[in-house]
């Protein structure tokens, strides 16, 4: 799945200036090209978007309480439980009682799910490595500096 770089109808001209639209297109091109590997590999997992979001949350945060997953997803506890039932049946997550509070249920990725994530990330890492090898040391430094600036700006904008 690739971002349609020629379809600028998705860009709101009242929000983004011409220069900002160009940055957006480049930003999306980088995300789709090098992000987490080939998006088609993720599509092969044949999961709903909410299921994928749960897996991403667990991959990023480790073990989470069911209530925390529901809160982060903006979903009801019953919907979250249904999602977790399907993911557990598919062998992607495992539930257990919290060691701190036995009444609380926690969820984590199974080793199989972790292996899948490692494989998907590895493909993205290899693609990025091959791409960076094509750059001169000066170009790599420029990419690093530009991404550092953008990362700081995105973090600061998130605080507002």
Curated annotation (Swiss-Prot):
Q: Which cysteines are joined by disulfide bonds?
A: none
Which keywords does this Swiss-Prot/TrEMBL entry list?
Answer: DNA-binding, Transcription, Transcription regulation
Q: What is this protein called?
A: Uncharacterized HTH-type transcriptional regulator YfiV
Q: Which GO terms describe its molecular function?
A: DNA binding; DNA-binding transcription factor activity
Any GO BP: regulation of DNA-templated transcription
Q: Which gene encodes it?
A: yfiV
| Cited InterPro entries | ArsR-like_HTH, HTH_MarR-typ, MarR/SlyA-like, WH-like_DNA-bd_sf, WH_DNA-bd_sf
Per its UniProt record, what Pfam families does this chain match? MarR
What positions does the DNA-binding region cover?
66-89
Every HTH marR-type domain range: 20-152
